[in-house]
Regions:
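Extended rod-forming repeat segments used as scaffolds/tethers
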Residues: 9-10, 62
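Sec-dependent signal peptide hydrophobic core
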Residues: 2-9
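C-terminal/domain-edge helix-coil "capping" segments
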Residues: 19-24, 105-166
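Generic N-terminal leader/processing signal
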Residues: 1, 16, 62-63
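Long, continuous compositionally biased terminal/linker segments
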Residues: 76-126
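A short, hydrophobic beta-strand-centered structural micro-motif
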Residues: 31-35, 56-98
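A structural "domain/chain start" motif
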Residues: 4, 14-56, 155-166
């Protein structure tokens, strides 16, 4: 009986604990500041090409790019290109940062009817892809990963902003 109860409790914890933490965090976002970080490669031409591709994808969905404003979308790309070994590795991380208020300060400002000025920068969305590729296909595979992450972001953005589909 005791083992059965433990199994039921653990099952319920797993079922309820798998919800996405970033649900509805992208609601109302129409302007973003793009930050692109490439670590491990010194290829400025490829970097500019990828940034242009990302900006064009945002224009396709009518998301405007602005300078020095929150929310900020960050593409962090870490590449370990090994010409000696057969495989090279990469990590592509897409994160969205926005201002937030701690729960304590939020409730305190409700009680005081004053708007708090203690804003924090918080990660409101994040997804990443870790992959391996040959050196010949490394750029192509990193670009495919960027495109997959962008598509995942847009899917979540449409879920949070359903009226933007029309």
């Amino acid at each position: 009986m005791k083992n059965w109860m433990i199994i039921v409790i653990l099952s319920l914890a797993c079922i309820t604990g798998k919800d996405r933490w970033y649900s509805k965090n992208l609601k109302g976002i129409e302007e973003l500041h793009l930050e692109f970080n490439l670590i491990g490669l010194d290829d400025s031409v490829w970097e500019k090409r990828v940034v242009s591709f990302i900006e064009l994808r945002f224009l396709e969905y009518d998301l405007r790019m602005v300078e020095n404003i929150m929310p900020k979308i960050s593409f962090d790309i870490h590449v370990l290109d090994s010409r000696v070994e057969k495989l090279s590795s990469f990590l592509v991380v897409l994160s969205v940062y926005n201002y937030s208020v701690s729960e304590k300060n939020y409730y305190k400002s409700l009680a005081d009817t004053l708007v708090t000025k203690r804003l924090m920068t918080s990660k409101v969305f994040s997804h990443e892809i870790l992959g391996q590729s040959s050196s010949q296909n490394l750029y192509r595979d990193v670009e495919k990963s960027i495109n997959q992450l962008f598509s995942f972001f847009i899917d979540q953005w449409y879920k949070d902003n359903p009226m933007k589909q029309f």
